[in-house]
Amino acid sequence: MSIIEAIILGLVQGLTEFLPISSSGHLRIVAAFSGWPDPGAAFTAVSQIGTELAVLIYFRKDVGNILATWFRSLGNKELRRHIDARMGWYVIIGSIPIGVAGLLFEEQISAPFRDLRLTALTLIVFGVLLGMVDRYSRKHRELTDLNAQRGLIYGLFQMLALIPGVSRSGATVTGGMLMGFKREAAARYAFLLAMPAVFASGLYKLKDIGGNEYAGVGATIVGTLVAFAVGYAVIAWFMRFISTNSFMPFVYYRIALGILILALVSFGVLTPESGAEFEGSAASVTAAEATH
């Protein structure tokens, strides 16, 4: 992978990570349109560390309070009912489904889920679902209404993001609004919930950088730094946007992009596996999996 490719893919990662339009799906699509090999699971996972660092900095006060109160509550029963202490447990509980599913279905995620037709269909289907929930759900709950059961349901929706095109933020925000949470509350918890899974996935995939993956160490570092810088600006804008707007612009975009991809595949402009393989210098290897 060239530095220019890394910059472009880092830009795509940063622009799409926090929007409900699927960053992994867009990385897959951009590679197909550009004629590049699929950037691979390791690049996708590690570059997401950059965007999650942006979340960590943007929500640093929330994260600091949650960590401090949660640790103190381990030895202080009176603190265990505090919202920050409970939030720590809810994030842990909500992270279990995607961790288990990611390990159990790693092989299935590797190849079949990279098919452009599936990416297009998930963009459309989950876009329609997001639109319906956003328009018709009764959004009245705040984060103080979160409990262990709702935290687990959030986690089950996040698990769907293992399929490119679903969108981690889109799936979890949809699940949150379906349970009655307001847009800002649903998004805030979705971003906090993503941190353990994304950091764990990125660290787990670090070992694959520079091996048979298309992206080398230098390109991955560049892409991650670009994703961090762009991601911070996007999350700041996105939280302001949803305070006064609905998710419908993203819904229309998802549906339009999904239809476009299906049309291009149908007419033979793209193949379902476009950009899915990377010919290494020593041998041909299949570019692997999705994380977001």
Curated annotation (Swiss-Prot):
Main location: membrane
EC number of the protein: 3.6.1.27
Keywords: Antibiotic resistance, Cell membrane, Cell shape, Cell wall biogenesis/degradation, Hydrolase, Membrane, Peptidoglycan synthesis, Transmembrane, Transmembrane helix
Substrates-to-products reaction catalysed: di-trans,octa-cis-undecaprenyl diphosphate + H2O = di-trans,octa-cis-undecaprenyl phosphate + phosphate + H(+)
Domain of life: Bacteria
InterPro entries for this protein: UppP
Protein's GO biological process: cell wall organization; peptidoglycan biosynthetic process; regulation of cell shape; response to antibiotic
Transmembrane intervals: 87-107, 113-133, 190-210, 219-239, 250-270
Subcellular location, record wording: Cell membrane
GO molecular function terms attached to this record: undecaprenyl-diphosphatase activity
GO cellular component terms, semicolon-separated: plasma membrane
One Pfam family named in its UniProt record: BacA
Lipid bilayer topology: Multi-pass membrane protein
Protein family (similarity comment): Belongs to the UppP family.
Extra remark: Bacitracin is thought to be involved in the inhibition of peptidoglycan synthesis by sequestering undecaprenyl diphosphate, thereby reducing the pool of lipid carrier available.
Function field: Catalyzes the dephosphorylation of undecaprenyl diphosphate (UPP). Confers resistance to bacitracin.
Name used for this protein in its record: Undecaprenyl-diphosphatase
Species whose genome carries this gene: Thermobifida fusca (strain YX)
Source taxonomy: Bacteria, Bacillati, Actinomycetota, Actinomycetes, Streptosporangiales
